[in-house]
Each structure stands twice: as structure tokens, then as C-alpha cells.
A protein has these predicted regions:
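Transmembrane helix-loop-helix hairpins at membrane boundaries of multipass inner-membrane proteins
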Residues: 1-8, 19-116, 189-204, 232, ...
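Hard-cation-handling environments
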Residues: 453-512, 543
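Hydrophobic transmembrane alpha-helices and their helix-loop junctions in integral membrane proteins
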Residues: 96-137, 146-459, 476
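Membrane-interfacial helical/loop segments at transmembrane boundaries in membrane proteins
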Residues: 60-71, 196-201, 404-408, 480-498
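Aromatic-capped, Gly/Pro-kinked transmembrane alpha-helices
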Residues: 481-500, 522-675
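Alpha-helical transmembrane segments and their membrane-interface junctions
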Residues: 388-404, 468-486, 555, 561, ...
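Hydrophobic alpha-helical transmembrane segments
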Residues: 76-91, 207-221, 420-424, 497-514
Length: 675
């Protein structure tokens, strides 16, 4: 009973509570801030209360549902290890960021809007991962995207923030359309949105249709989890407050695509391996994204940019592992989720520490840093833990989770994927060393000497310290997590140290470390020449492999072509809309001229009548062209009058759904302007 109540309250509570943030803010801003923290705390408690029942042996998914839009379309919760793992992650990080925000966002304008969106996001993200059907999941999928857009554009007075928000919104919408297509095909094939029904009846769908569903779903995951080729939005999203970057763009929202593919693999079951090229495509997208993200992290001078590209790369690791699932082994599926949690801890830690550094220095450019080790020793120590974990060194969490990913890809047998993933681990170590050198080591820059930097407030350091502890502790949870996730895979702590992949892993770190040492510590002439702008490779990295350049050219030309087409169509419509009336008018005039030559008043009156009708028609058509909105309004009124015939029970559902959507949109508009 407790888990049933908790599974509903864990997402409904933050959603409803978000509506009270503006009300409380009218009385006390401090109460508003702590209200958000308290709700986040209660949400986290509710999330953790879901663990015991699964841990103590529930073999089948739990949950319940209720009628929503109609008796056939329900809203419900689906409690299994996958949904609970994500729910706990989102709720825990929501609490961490709510506490961190008390310090980081102190004194900012628009905090009512910030905390409203924060709670709305937490509720929406949990709703996404705990839904028991595709339609409900998609509604929350869209709400998460809307919150992301609003939070990225939080500093809306900055043009770059508005542009970044719009870019993220538009690029992720491509994935949303793809996912919606998959859901539509699934519903057309099964007649149900339910996960349970899909699991029981998925085999009835023809393989070509199922393949289309799988690839369309992958399209949604690619956009949401910043995979090639729709990855460029994540770097632009760094215009958001760093607390937002930590929650949405490191720990939770960007993992929605990973959740989606992991869920689809569970639904497909053995059929996943019969779909032509689907799993290999998932693996290749992940491997290439991981490699490309690591190379860009090694180039950018932006401290948040390094973390953004690192996130893209680590998401690639997770996607690659999901693609390495085989009929005989689910190790890749487990490794992906194990690393998903590891990444949340070390990348979330990185963003929290970057927020403290930016808070103290007022810049994101690492070239203006250096020498922070003395001024910010606690931040330095925590950053060292973050980098060692990111690099996958023992005994930190990513050593175990990343090792399992490498093992799963090795077992899958594609040698080129294995080579690229090893190369990516070397690049990860390299950009980690570069991060530490540019930020903390060496002499203070002139910029720092003028600022006299200091440690971040304790309210910002405590959440970071908790994540640092988890960076160490999480790796030892692997054997327990295997049982919790109900996966048949061998995970051994000692086995991680003595696996065949471990010596290779350590061997490739040596040249990576040597290159960074020669470049940034010894300033080797050869390496400095390699890094010069004259090197074509540096030009490629500077432009991010030219993805944005291509997109801007395509969309720019597309918009120009579309605009020109609309203009011509409009001119054609406006020129032709009165032609029927003018034709009638001309015909009537000729009739009148003819009748004057032949006979009396009756024909003349008929001609005059036709002329009057023609003039009225011409006037009406001109008004129609100029006042399309009035026509739309008229149609809407007619539609509303027809709703009288709709059964009252259905009408109540439609009105309730429409009213809820209207209230949410209205609140977002009001809060975006500022309260």
C-alpha cells in the first residue's frame, strides 16, 4: 500500500506544489526558496520508499492505473527496477540542486519562476520514467522539454540565452516528432498505449513495422540524449544557470533517451535481436558520439563546455552499451544503467564545482584561470575526485561501470567499436588532465590577481561533497545493483581489477597523459605547432565538426525558400480571391448591355440583380481574405455548439485536460515575463 501511494505522490506532489510557488512568493521570498527544498526532500523520501518492495523480491512489475481521457486511455504508474532507479536518481538530484540553488541563485531576479520550473521539471521527469503507457510518457516527455527551454532561457534579457533556448527547443522537437511517429505506429498495431499490453502482444506486430517503430524511437532518444547528429544543442544549453545544467543536462533530462531505449529493449525482449541493424545502429551511434564528444572536450576553453562535451561523450558510452546487448547476454543493458548513475554523480559534481568557480571568477574561460589550487583548495580536491572518476581510474565508480561497458562491447565482437571506445577512454583522461592544468595548476592569471577568488559558500560545497562521496562509493554497489535490476550478469569487484580489458585500459592512458604533459606543462614546440590554428584538425574542432554550420545553412536556405513560397502563394490567393466575383460582374454588365438592345424592364432588373449580387460577393471575398481570424472564430463557435451532443462524462475529461493545459501554459507565460 505504501509503495502504491508513494508511486503516485512522488510525481504529483512536485507538480501540484509548483503552482503554489508564486503564491508563497507573494508573502515571503525566503519561504518560497525553502518551500521548494522541503518539497524536493519529501519527493526524495517518497522515491526511496519505492526501493524496499523491489529489493525484497517483487519479480513482476507493480503499479496501478485509472481512467484518464477515456475508459480506454488510462494514466498509471509502472514500478519495476528501471523506473525506480530513474525515479530515485531524479528525486535525489532534485533535492541536491534545490539546496545548491539556495547559494548559487541567491540575489538573482526571477527566482519565483526558477523554483516554479524546478519543481515542475522534477515532477515531469519522474512522471516520464514512472508512466505505465507511451501516451502518458510522451506528455511528460514534452513537459520536460518545455521546462528545459524555459530554464535555459532563464536569463531572458541575454540574447544568447534566448537563442540557446530556441535552438534546444527546435532540435529536440525533431526527436519528439520521431517518437510520436513510433507511438502512433505502435497504437495502430496494438490498439493500446500500455507497456504491459505491449510486452504481452509485441510479437503480433510484423517485423517491418516493428523495425520502423524501433528506429523512430531511436530518433527520439538521439535528440533527447544529445547523440550524433543531434548533439549540438547540449553545448548551447550551457547558457542556462549552472544549477540547471547540473540537474537537466548532466544528471537527469539527457538520460531520458537512455531510459527510452532501455525500456524499449525490455518491451521487445528477444525480438530486439531480430530487427535488421537496429542494435548495431544504436551501438555505432553511441561509439561515434563518445569519440567525437571527447575530442571536442579536449579542445574547448569553456569550463562548462568541457563538461557539456564530456556529458555527450559519456552518454555515447551508455548508448553504445545498450547496442551491445545480445540474445545471450544483458551485460550491456546493465552496464549502461550502472554507468548512467556513475555519470550523474561525477558530471553533476563537475557542474556544481564549475558553478562555484564561475561564481567566484565571473568567467567560464579556463584561459583566464590557473593557480586556483591555493585560493580554492576544497574545490581543487573535489575536482580531482571528479576527474579521476571521469577518467575511470580505480577505485572510483566509473572504473567499474566503464569497465563493464568495454567488456560488453568486446563480447559483442565489433573490433572497430572496441578500438574507438578505447581511444575515447584515453581522450577522456587527456581532457581531464587539461581541465585540472588550466583551472588549478600553474601561476595565477592576471584576471585572478584582480579578483582575489575564494571558496564557494558552504551551502554550495555540501551538495558537491555528497556527490564526491558517491563517486567513490557507487562503484562498490555493482554486485547489489545486479540483483536489484534482476539481470543475469556476472559483476565482481575483484574481477574488474583482473579482467583482460584492464591492462589495455591502463596502457592507453600513458600516451594520453604524456601528450598532455608535453603540451600544457612543458609547452613542447612540436605539440604547440600541432595545436596552432594552421592545423586543419584544429579548425575542424573549432567548428565542432561543422554540424552547426551545415544546420544553419540548411535551415537558413529552407526558411528563405519557405518564406518566398508563402509570399508567392499569398499573392496568388489575394490576386485570385476576387476573380469569381469580377467574372460575374463582367458577365452581368454584358447582359445589361444586350438587354438594352432587345427588350424591356424585366431583363434589365434581372441584370441589375446579378450586378448587385456580384458586387456583394466581391466585397465579401475581400473581407474574407483580410479577416481570416473571424472565419476561424466562426468555425470554432460552430464546433463548440456541436459539443452539446458529446456525452457529459467525456466532455468533462476533455474540458479538464484542456483547462489543465491552459493553466500550465498561462502560468509559464506569466512566469517567463517575471513575477
Amino acid at each position: 500500500v505504501l509503495s502504491d501511494v508513494s508511486s503516485w505522490l512522488v510525481w504529483i506532489l512536485p507538480l501540484i506544489s509548483s503552482l503554489f510557488v508564486p503564491v508563497i512568493a507573494r508573502f515571503s521570498e525566503k519561504a518560497r526558496n525553502y518551500f521548494a527544498v522541503i518539497i524536493s526532500l519529501v519527493t526524495a523520501v517518497l522515491a526511496f520508499s519505492l526501493l524496499p518492495e523491489l529489493f525484497f523480491g517483487a519479480e513482476e512489475a507493480l503499479g496501478s492505473s485509472t481512467a484518464w481521457i477515456s475508459s480506454e486511455i488510462t494514466a498509471g504508474v509502472f514500478i519495476d527496477p528501471l523506473s525506480v532507479l530513474f525515479t530515485v536518481l531524479v528525486a535525489f538530484f532534485g533535492l541536491i540542486i534545490a539546496i545548491y540553488s539556495l547559494g548559487y541563485m541567491k540575489g538573482e531576479e526571477g527566482l519565483t519562476r526558477y523554483y516554479f520550473l524546478l519543481l515542475l521539471f522534477i515532477g515531469s521527469m519522474i512522471g516520464l520514467v514512472i508512466s505505465d503507457n507511451f501516451l502518458q510518457m510522451f506528455v511528460f516527455w514534452e513537459m520536460v522539454g518545455l521546462c528545459s527551454y524555459a530554464l535555459i532561457s532563464f536569463w531572458y534579457k541575454r540574447p544568447e540565452s534566448i537563442r540557446a533556448g530556441a535552438k534546444v527547443f527546435l532540435m529536440t522537437r525533431l526527436g519528439d516528432v520521431s517518437l510520436l511517429g513510433a507511438i502512433g505506429l505502435l497504437y495502430a498495431s496494438l490498439g493500446s498505449f500500455s507497456f504491459r499490453y505491449a510486452i504481452d502482444n509485441i510479437a503480433t506486430i510484423p517485423v517491418p513495422t516493428l523495425t520502423a517503430i524501433a528506429f523512430l524511437t531511436l530518433g527520439g532518444a538521439i535528440a533527447k540524449s544529445a547523440q550524433l547528429p543531434l548533439h549540438t544543442w547540449l553545448y548551447s544549453a550551457m547558457e542556462a544557470p549552472t544549477s540547471v545544467s547540473a540537474l537537466l543536462h548532466a544528471a537527469t533530462m539527457v538520460k531520458a533517451g537512455i531510459y527510452l531505449i532501455a525500456r524499449l529493449i525490455l518491451i521487445l525482449g528477444p525480438l530486439a535481436f531480430s530487427l535488421p541493424m537496429w542494435l548495431p545502429t544504436v551501438a555505432w551511434i553511441g561509439v561515434l558520439t563518445a569519440f567525437m564528444g571527447a575530442t571536442l572536450a579536449l579542445y574547448t576553453p569553456d569550463i562548462k563546455g568541457v563538461l557539456a562535451y564530456s556529458t555527450i561523450s559519456q552518454l555515447g558510452f551508455m548508448m553504445a552499451a545498450l547496442g551491445a546487448v545480445s540474445l545471450n547476454s544483458s551485460l550491456g543493458w546493465f552496464a549502461s544503467l550502472f554507468h548512467m548513475m556513475s555519470h550523474a554523480f561525477f558530471e553533476g559534481l563537475g557542474f556544481l564545482l564549475a558553478g562555484g568557480i564561475i561564481h567566484a571568477l565571473g568567467t567560464r574561460d579556463m584561459r583566464l584561470m590557473g593557480g586556483l589550487k591555493k585560493a580554492m583548495p576544497i574545490t581543487f580536491g573535489l575536482s580531482l575526485i571528479m576527474i579521476l572518476t571521469t577518467s575511470g581510474l580505480p577505485p572510483f565508480a566509473a572504473f567499474f561501470s566503464k569497465g563493464l561497458i568495454i567488456t560488453s562491447l568486446t563480447e559483442a565482437g565489433n573490433i572497430w567499436q572496441v578500438v574507438l571506445i578505447y581511444a575515447t577512454t584515453a581522450l577522456t583522461f587527456a581532457y581531464g588532465l587539461r581541465f585540472m592544468k588550466l583551472t588549478f595548476m600553474g601561476d595565477e592569471s592576471e584576471h585572478l590577481k584582480e579578483l582575489h577568488p575564494h571558496e564557494a559558500p558552504k551551502i554550495m560545497l555540501y551538495p558537491a561533497a555528497i556527490l564526491a562521496v558517491l563517486c567513490v562509493a557507487w562503484g562498490f554497489v555493482g554486485p547489489w545493483l545486479v540483483n536489484f535490476m534482476q539481470v543475469e550478469a556476472e559483476v565482481s569487484l575483484l574481477g574488474a581489477f583482473f579482467s583482460l580489458e584492464t591492462p589495455i585500459f591502463f596502457a592507453i592512458l600513458v600516451p594520453a597523459g604524456l601528450i598532455i604533459y608535453l603540451t600544457y606543462y612543458k609547452h613542447s614546440g612540436v605539440m604547440m605547432k600541432f595545436r596552432s590554428s594552421a592545423n586543419p584538425l584544429m579548425t575542424v574542432l573549432k567548428h565542432g565538426y561543422f554540424f552547426d554550420d551545415v544546420y544553419e545553412r540548411i535551415t537558413g536556405r529552407g526558411i528563405i525558400t519557405l518564406s518566398e513560397g508563402v509570399r508567392r502563394a499569398n499573392e496568388t490567393v489575394m490576386d485570385n480571391v476576387g476573380k469569381p466575383a469580377r467574372g460575374i460582374l463582367s458577365f452581368a454588365s454584358r447582359v445589361r448591355n444586350l438587354e438594352s438592345s432587345y427588350s424591356g424592364n424585366l431583363p434589365q432588373k434581372m441584370a441589375n440583380l446579378i450586378i448587385a449580387v456580384a458586387r456583394a460577393a466581391q466585397k465579401y471575398l475581400d473581407v474574407l481574405a483580410d479577416n481570416l481570424l473571424s472565419i476561424i472564430a466562426h468555425r470554432t463557435m460552430r464546433g463548440a455548439s456541436r459539443m452539446k451532443n458529446v456525452p457529459s462524462s467525456s466532455l468533462q475529461h476533455y474540458i479538464a485536460a484542456a483547462l489543465l493545459g491552459f493553466i500550465l501554459i498561462l502560468l509559464l507565460i506569466i512566469l517567463t515575463v517575471g513575477i
